[in-house]
Every structure is written in structure tokens, then in C-alpha cells.
């Protein structure tokens, strides 16, 4: 098994899981992960060495998801947005959580999703490309902010 194949087998499930949680669409998540792997493969073919492939791939995935979410938000029809706001109370819990995550800043969303996936503070710092010392405080503030958003959306937390 070559280096690319072993990296693919190791990283694909993690990348897909993060992308699916961020964009809330299985097909789009698969497309994003595929696009990242194509780009990574092209880098390898051109002789460019990625020293920490897992961190690089996960960072590329979260960045691509943020770009997609920005695009989707910018190009979403206004009627769909108003329907979303009007029907919040009837949404499934996952839909409400997804809406709450969408209200966070891109970096905040990345950190919450990585944390929920079980990544350590050190791994979150590497993937999000931030200082290790700021992860705990930023994550704490973000989780508090998320809790407030969920409360505003009448999300019942256990």
C-alpha cells in the first residue's frame, strides 16, 4: 500500500465526518472530501511534500466547508431563509443544532465540531492553525455562546 492510499484510508472517515457535520449534507460532504484528496494527490504528484498530512487534510476540509457555507449563505434564496426562521420550532433537534452552528463564526464552528469529534486541544490547535494556549478559553466561550443560541431557538438540552 502506498503513502497516498494509507493516508486516504486513515483520514477519509475523519474528514467525511467533520464535513458532514459542518455542511449537513452527505453528498456535499463527499464532494468536499473528494476535492481535497484530488488536490492533495496533485501536490504529491508535483513533488510537494506535506509534512503532517492528517493535520493538513483536516484543516483543508474545515476550510473548504467554511467556504461552502459562506457561499451557500450568500446565495440562499430569501424565501428559504424566512421559512427557516418561521419554522424553527418544528425542526428536528439535529436541524436546530445545525442552525445554531451556522450562527457561529467559522473558526468557532470548526473548533466545536472538532471538539465534538473527540480531538484533543493540541490537535484542534494544529488543525485550526491557532495557538494551543488559546484553544481552551476560545472553546469555552464558544460553547457558552452556542448554549445561548440553542436556548434562544428553544432547543431542549438534557
What are these regions (language model features)?
Residues 1-17, 27-30:
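A short, charge-rich alpha-helical start-of-domain segment used by transcription regulators
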Residues 15, 19, 29-40, 57-60, ...:
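Short, small-hydrophobic-rich alpha-helical interface motif
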Residues 35-52, 72:
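Sigma70-family region 2
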Residues 59-78:
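Arg/Lys-rich amphipathic alpha helix in sigma70-family domain 2
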Residues 79-102:
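Acidic, proline/glycine-rich intrinsically disordered inter-domain spacer in sigma factors
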Residues 102, 106-107, 117-137:
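Helix-turn-helix DNA-binding module
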Residues 111-112:
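A short pre-motif secondary-structure segment
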Residues 128-153:
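DNA-recognition helix of helix-turn-helix
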